[in-house]
Regions:
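Short glycine-biased active-site loop of nucleotidyltransferases that positions the nucleotide triphosphate
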Residues: 79-82
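Short Gly/aromatic-enriched secondary-structure transition segments
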Residues: 39-47
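Basic/polar, cationic surfaces and motifs that engage anionic cell-wall
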Residues: 1-26, 30, 63-67, 72, ...
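Eukaryotic intrinsically disordered, low-complexity regulatory tails
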Residues: 55-56, 122
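A short acidic/small-residue loop/turn micro-motif
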Residues: 74-76
Length: 166
């Protein structure tokens, strides 16, 4: 698979730590009281204002399907207690207990999962989980969590049908 189109920002981080392994891809949502959309740059600014290193997510997917780069992939995310050293995190903009992910978000998420699974030798089945699978939280929201099997099926399809250059 060819790398997805990923928008990159010039984000500055405080101290970052290397990931030990890549065992999981963990899915998150914004989860605010409103179905709000935030860019990777806006999340980074909020996290820095909290005196954190910067955005805790490796990727953000906007409602229009645009994938945005957060933390560098070689680093630990800051998103899921006990699993930061062994996971990549994808964050979708929106509250998916209130709203639903857009068609564009779902397609981008499936393709990104497929590409990451191919890069790291993972399977979309078993290695892709919702935040709630590891921590006591509603994240990534019922409306997205209920779609993860379907999304992982699309990711698997992309892996089997899109080769480099397709």
């Amino acid at each position: 698979m060819k790398e997805p189109d990923i928008k990159k920002y010039d984000l500055e981080f405080r101290e970052l730590y290397s990931r030990q392994a890549t065992d999981y891809i963990i899915i998150h949502h914004t989860g605010n009281d409103i179905d709000e959309e935030l860019s990777a740059e806006e999340i980074h600014r909020i996290h820095r204002a909290n005196d954190w290193s910067g955005i805790g997510y490796h990727f953000v997917i906007r409602k229009n399907g645009q994938i945005e780069k957060g933390r560098p992939l070689w680093t630990q995310g800051s998103h899921c207690l006990n699993y930061n050293p062994i996971s990549i995190v994808i964050h979708l903009s929106g509250n998916f207990n209130i709203g639903k992910p857009t068609h564009y978000q779902i397609e981008s998420l499936a393709y990104l999962i497929g590409w990451l699974c191919e890069q790291y030798g993972l399977s979309p089945y078993g290695n892709v989980v919702g935040h709630r699978d590891f921590n006591a939280t509603e994240c990534p929201g019922d409306n997205l969590y209920d779609m993860l099997d379907e999304i992982c099926g699309k990711a698997d399809w992309y892996m089997n049908n899109y080769k480099d250059g397709d």
